């Protein structure tokens, strides 16, 4: 891709000019700036010689530039996606099952038939009333019967008795507080 022009490239010259300008004779950057050099005892005096005299021969050696990165041709291996997806049919809660049946069943049926190759009409959106009627249109075997239990009656009486004092005092407080308005 070196001979092709990069449509997304915003630089004028490219990497070749940058590499040529760095190798053409620009000095290598120093390892430490003079203002950053530390004055520790170990750095400043080693066997009676100052640190600046010792560091001078090390800076004479040129630091080699890192090799240029390999040329990127822009090709990325495509991600392999599996075309066949088995839709999970297990639903944990009965409420979620009823909601799915009520709301999404037409669309799911359309997708299932389309995957098997059967032509089917595209489902139209339902009104709220249609969805409610579909939910309540349950066969006799699926009806959950409710038989009032003795425990339910006891809980209702206990709750009513425990909240009675709260209701009384709240009503008394409101009447007293807002007597001038009422």
From Swiss-Prot:
Transmembrane segments: none
Keywords attached to this entry: Muscle protein, Phosphoprotein
Post-translational modification: Several forms of flightin are thought to be produced through post-translational modifications, possibly by phosphorylation.
MF annotations from Gene Ontology: structural constituent of muscle; structural molecule activity conferring elasticity
Domain of life (superkingdom): Eukaryota
GO annotations of cellular component type: A band; striated muscle myosin thick filament
Tissue: Found only in indirect flight muscles (IFM).
Swiss-Prot/TrEMBL GO biological process terms: adult somatic muscle development; oscillatory muscle contraction; sarcomere organization; striated muscle myosin thick filament assembly
Compositionally biased tracts (Acidic residues): 1-15
Disordered: region residues: 1-76
Biological role stated in the UniProt entry: Possibly involved in the regulation of flight muscles contraction, possibly by modulating actin-myosin interaction.
Record protein name field: Flightin
Annotated gene: fln
């Amino acid at each position: 891709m070196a001979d092709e022009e990069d449509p997304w490239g915003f630089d004028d010259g490219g990497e070749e000019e940058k590499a040529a300008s760095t190798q053409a004779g620009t000095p290598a950057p120093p390892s430490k700036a003079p203002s950053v050099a530390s004055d520790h005892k170990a750095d400043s005096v080693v066997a009676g010689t100052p640190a600046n005299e010792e560091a001078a021969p090390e800076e004479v050696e040129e630091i080699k530039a890192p090799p240029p990165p390999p040329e990127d041709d822009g090709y990325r291996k495509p991600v392999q996606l599996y075309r066949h997806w088995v839709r999970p049919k297990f639903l944990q809660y009965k409420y979620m099952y009823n909601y799915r049946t009520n709301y999404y069943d037409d669309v799911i049926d359309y997708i299932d038939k389309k995957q098997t190759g059967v032509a089917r009409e595209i489902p139209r959106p339902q009104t709220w009333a249609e969805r409610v009627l579909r939910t309540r249109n349950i066969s006799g075997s699926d009806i959950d019967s409710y038989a009032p239990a003795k425990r339910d009656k006891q809980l209702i009486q206990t709750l009513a008795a425990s909240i009675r004092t709260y209701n009384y005092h709240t009503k008394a407080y409101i009447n007293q507080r807002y007597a001038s308005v009422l």
